[in-house]
Curated annotation (Swiss-Prot):
Subcellular location per the Swiss-Prot or TrEMBL entry: Mitochondrion
Name assigned to this protein: Uncharacterized mitochondrial protein AtMg00010
Keywords of this entry: Mitochondrion
Domain of life: Eukaryota
One Gene Ontology term, aspect cellular component: mitochondrion
Primary location recorded for the protein, binned into one broad class: mitochondrion
UniProt source species: Arabidopsis thaliana
Amino acid sequence: MSLLFQQTVPLSHLHRSLDPPLCFRTHILLILLLLSRHLPGFTGSDCESADPSIVSAIAPGTATTSERDCPVRTAGSDPVPIGDSGTFFDVGTAAPELLSPNRHHMITRAKDGIRKPNPRYNLFTQKYTPSEPKTITSASQDGDKLCKKRCRH
């Protein structure tokens, strides 16, 4: 149980059901371990300092978690074992369908050779004129004008 979890829930050792399952706590470590084994440039230095019991549980050839530790996982839900290296996408070769050109029938302005902005999206701005006068004299003049305007109507 993590230290953070113990601080937020005191006496959590009495309530084992509140402890998050092992499968939810080890996903990041699992990803780091798998990357360090299958990508040549990835060192995985974070994996070496991890808890040895978790690392041994994630090692290839062994099951990651039991059904008791991870209630979400069932026996038939994982068709390929986690340690199988054949399931990884090879970084050196790209899938041909990912590199196919866009066959969409609509043409954008850039594809049509138009480089200037669309005038429909121009922004109209107007200089802001403050409603508060800057000096006392202009304030008194504005007040006189406002009073005269109100008196007319």
